[in-house]
Amino acid sequence: MADRATRRPGLPVDGSSPAAVFFTSGTTGRPRAVVSGHSATTSLFCGGFEPFASAPTMLQAAPPTWDGFTLETWGPLVNGGTCVLPEGEYLLPGVLRELADRDGVDTAWLTASLFHLFLDEDPGCFQGLSHVLTGGERLSVPRVRTFLERHPAAGLTNGYGPVETCVFATARRIRPADCDVPTGIPIGVPVPGRRVHVLSEDREAGPGTTGEICVSGEGLAAGYLDDDPLTTRRFPTLTIDGARTRVYRTGDLGFQDADGVLHFLGRGDRQVKIRGHRVEPEEVEAAARGLSGVRECAVVPVPGKNESHEGLALFYTPAKNADGSDGPDPKALRRTLATLLPRHLVPGVVRSRDRLPLTASGKLDRTALTDSLRRHDHTEGDL
């Protein structure tokens, strides 16, 4: 410490200067270090973003390595609000309830996986909150309905945005009618400091046309720490509406409706090839998620030799059926899926779990599921 300077270095700082390094969640591989600038934060929270417009008292539970830390810290503080830190290593539904009662917490951010888990464990734990922000993954429509019915006075915002766009690129305050949208809960319109482009062959797709979701604006990161080639690939400069525009390519697929609302359709890079067929795991997830007795599910490719894939594996958490009976066992679930899906999409491995694994940032950990297939003979006890 004695060797360190005692005065400010006097380096010039502007909106593009690095402010923090955040890490991606690593749900499908190794976390990447993302360099985020000052304007990425200030443009979002100084721009009248609705959940932070009234000096909220917000739960601050995200680790500082994740951009959720920025949301929970600067969101309230730059708007005259307060941060409340929970005691203990893990946030539990009872802790959230206690913080609302004791410390006046009125706003909280939970990943979709944690939001679902809290609703399953204790649907009343959100009592006293005026606003809940969630997202990062596809929301469960039945759980959203449960929240809206039990907490009609509370706002529920679905936020979408990779770490590379600093917290959110779009957001939508969910309304009951959103639960009836065929493609799932919409992910909204751009938040302050961001623009969204749905591109097909690097051209803007029209309303209702599927394309890759790309983001531009002040919210973009400078790039990946010490990885210039990846930065160049994921943050290209394209000509959009006649202007050269730096964008972040999310790899997600979606479309904008006639009102400009963005709808998420899935990942564009999860496609795998199995026995000559190109397969979208999300198609299987959507079919399983629509069945009575399936609470959560995830589909991952079964690792084969030489980086090939031998088939699909479905992991799910069972729920009670509408008539109160137990949810399907793996064999019954696979039989049902076989009546709904083409043969090459029917998972060869089906496993029931009490809970699906989560990363440190609270998102579904697909890598852990794949690793479990590598650790054990995936034919033992499976279909």
Short names for language-model regions:
Residues M1-L11, T41, G155-N158, R173-L383:
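AMP-dependent adenylate-forming
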